[in-house]
A protein has these predicted regions:
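Acyl-group handoff/entry surfaces in thioester-processing enzymes
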Residues: 121-123
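Generic secondary-structure boundary/loop-capping signal
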Residues: 95-98, 102, 119, 135
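Extracellular/periplasmic catalytic domains that process cell-envelope and extracellular macromolecules
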Residues: 19-21, 74-77, 92-94, 128-133, ...
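Conserved N-terminal structural module of periplasmic/extracytoplasmic solute-binding proteins
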Residues: 3-97, 108-117, 158-167
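Short beta-strand element of the conserved SAM-dependent methyltransferase core
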Residues: 6, 126-128
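Helix-loop-helix "hinge/cap" segment bordering the ligand-binding cleft or interdomain interface
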Residues: 102-107, 129-168
Length: 168
């Protein structure tokens, strides 16, 4: 009974989807431990709770990027959902082919969005938000980014002047 109450919105949404003929959804992600867990454990739990099967393809990162770009260029997606690194947010935003998640959750996806979902519970939404201030995906897994640069080159006045002349 606890499970039923806890997952009420998933169960209710699943019933509506099943009434529309949805029996399976397909998603793709790169092959890393986090996504292997999602594929093996969370997909199974989702099916047990909702009755909707999740087909979760695990492929190499480069293949995810290639398939995603092909889908954006063609306007046809072979997957219902994509789990991609947050550093692709710029690509999602620039192509203009991805519906921002924040727009979807507030608009036509509102009936499918768990009313208990609080985006403040997620760490890293700044990494999955584009320059238009819209959220394009929920942060799934994050890793520290470290950028190296040569301070001696940045300190050179001649290079600073060239940069300023070119870029303002």
């Amino acid at each position: 009974e606890f499970r039923r109450v806890l997952f009420r919105s998933f169960i209710d949404a699943a019933k509506k989807l099943q009434a529309k003929g949805v029996k399976e959804i397909s998603v793709v992600s790169e092959t890393i431990t986090t996504h292997e867990y999602e594929s093996k454990t969370l997909a199974k739990a989702f099916e047990e709770i909702t009755g909707i099967k999740v087909k979760h393809d695990l492929i190499q990162e480069g293949d995810v990027v290639e398939k995603l770009q092909t889908s954006m260029q063609s306007g046809k997606s072979i997957y219902d959902g994509w789990i991609s690194d947050s550093d692709l947010i710029g690509t999602h935003y620039r192509y203009g082919k991805i519906l921002p998640l924040s727009d979807y959750m507030a608009g036509k996806g509102k009936e499918w969005t768990n009313p208990g979902l609080d985006l403040k519970d997620f760490i890293g939404t700044s990494f999955t938000t584009a320059p238009d201030k819209k959220l394009y995906q929920l942060p799934d897994q994050q890793f520290a980014n470290l950028y190296w640069f040569r301070a001696d080159l940045f300190a050179r006045k001649d290079l600073q002047d060239k940069f300023k002349a070119k870029f303002g």
